[in-house]
């Protein structure tokens, strides 16, 4: 099974209970089609970078999951027909480096930027 991340934005007009129902629906689509959910992160309501369908804000949700490849087509179909989802993005993690990042993100850990080696300043050569 492959590692995936699904980010979607719900309409801000939904109540907490309605938003939970939509998140549960997406989780159910994943599990019924052979996927395993690693974690669900509800990021809350945030301001959008630009208006989407007259909305300036949206409720962000990220789901980290493992699934067979054929599940993605069914998941995308269900997300598209859900009117309360105004945008979504599915990301596939492929190589070992990406999968280790997926593991950290799914556990709620932040990724640390690669450390840069600092060179000591060279001493100027004195002329004799």
Curated annotation (Swiss-Prot):
Binds together with bS18 to 16S ribosomal RNA. One of its GO terms (cellular component) is cytosolic small ribosomal subunit. This is Small ribosomal subunit protein bS6. Disulfide bonds: none annotated. It comes from Campylobacter fetus subsp. fetus (strain 82-40). GO terms for molecular function: small ribosomal subunit rRNA binding; structural constituent of ribosome. One of its GO terms (biological process) is translation. The lineage of its organism: Bacteria, Pseudomonadati, Campylobacterota, Epsilonproteobacteria, Campylobacterales. Belongs to the bacterial ribosomal protein bS6 family.
